[in-house]
From Swiss-Prot:
Keyword Nucleotide-binding tagged: no
InterPro entries, sorted: Ribosomal_uS2, Ribosomal_uS2_bac/mit/plastid, Ribosomal_uS2_flav_dom_sf
Name listed for the protein in its UniProt record: Small ribosomal subunit protein uS2
Organism, scientific name: Phytoplasma australiense
Region (Disordered): 240-260
Family affiliation: Belongs to the universal ribosomal protein uS2 family.
Entries under NCBIfam families matching the protein: rpsB_bact
Domain of life: Bacteria
GO cellular component terms given for this protein: cytosolic small ribosomal subunit
One of the GO biological process terms: translation
Gene3D superfamilies given in the database record: Glucose-6-phosphate isomerase like protein, domain 1, Helix hairpin bin
Length: 260
């Protein structure tokens, strides 16, 4: 049974690539045509690649592997957090801190500090401290939570990295490749597919497109862990809100204007 329908891919705008002036020739085989100066991705190939990624990711999780979801663009932060939590995996949805993978032992120390700060507050230690010091501790805790909250239970390196926006997250991808961590990624028409082990050619800017693909990846993790993944009909792209953009007269349809 297919994990996504062609209709869902179209409704979510996964087929809208970047401007024909901003493209990577290595993505040529995934491009169907161009329209109004925008490359249109072949959703048949997107569907095929989704199936490949789904099966491999399910296998990794079934064998006890963990997956790190990564997407730091403001409009997709919620989707990354919600779907990773739904499938019980890890996530980074704000700035990628250099060394999260390649310098993990140092990151673990920061994570431990985060746990210590939470425990101090829960145990009432902060109540005995001056207000000024408590404010500083809360500020430190909140900052750590913002950047490391999604991986605070990650005790070892993940076996797979799922990325939204390969170009923006290139530092994280480089770290994963250096450690032979498998990289799964939405790859838009301006990106280099050779950097990825499992490519999903798709629009990585539109909220609905990212939500759909991230939802599918989460389903793969759920199925791999022995759970019951949601069926395609349970996803409704129309319920995913569009980003609020400033009014522009004579603009193109939404999916074509969110591109860089």
């Amino acid at each position: 049974m297919a994990v996504v329908t062609m209709k869902q891919l179209l409704e979510s705008g996964t087929n809208f690539g970047h401007s024909t002036r901003k493209w990577n020739p290595k993505m040529k085989k995934y491009i169907f045509t161009s329209r109004n100066g925008i490359h249109i991705i072949d959703i048949k190939k997107t569907s095929e690649k989704i199936e490949e990624a789904y099966q491999e990711l399910s296998k990794i999780v079934n064998q006890g592997g963990k997956v790190l979801f990564l997407g730091t663009k403001k409009q997709i932060q919620t989707s990354i957090m919600e779907e990773s939590k739904r499938c019980g995996q890890y996530y980074v949805n704000h700035r990628w801190l250099g060394g999260i993978l390649t310098n993990f032992h140092t990151i673990l120390k920061r994570i431990q500090l985060l746990h210590d700060l939470h425990k101090q507050e829960e145990d009432g230690v902060w109540k005995k401290l001056p207000k000024k010091e408590v404010v500083q501790l809360k500020r430190k805790r909140d900052k750590l939570e913002k950047f490391l909250g999604g991986i605070k239970d990650m005790k070892e390196l993940p076996q797979a990295l799922f990325v939204v926006d390969l170009e923006k997250e290139k530092n994280a991808v480089a770290e994963a490749r250096k450690l032979n961590i498998k990289v799964f990624s939405m790859v838009d028409t301006n990106c280099d597919p050779d950097l990825v082990d499992y490519i999903i050619p798709a629009n990585d800017d539109a909220i609905r497109s990212v939500k759909l693909i991230t939802w599918i990846i989460a389903n793969a993790c759920i199925e791999g862990s022995g759970g019951v993944a949601e069926k395609p009909e349970q996803f409704d792209a129309k319920n995913v809100l569009k980003p609020k953009l400033p009014y522009q007269p004579n603009r193109r349809p939404y999916q074509e204007t969110v591109k860089k």
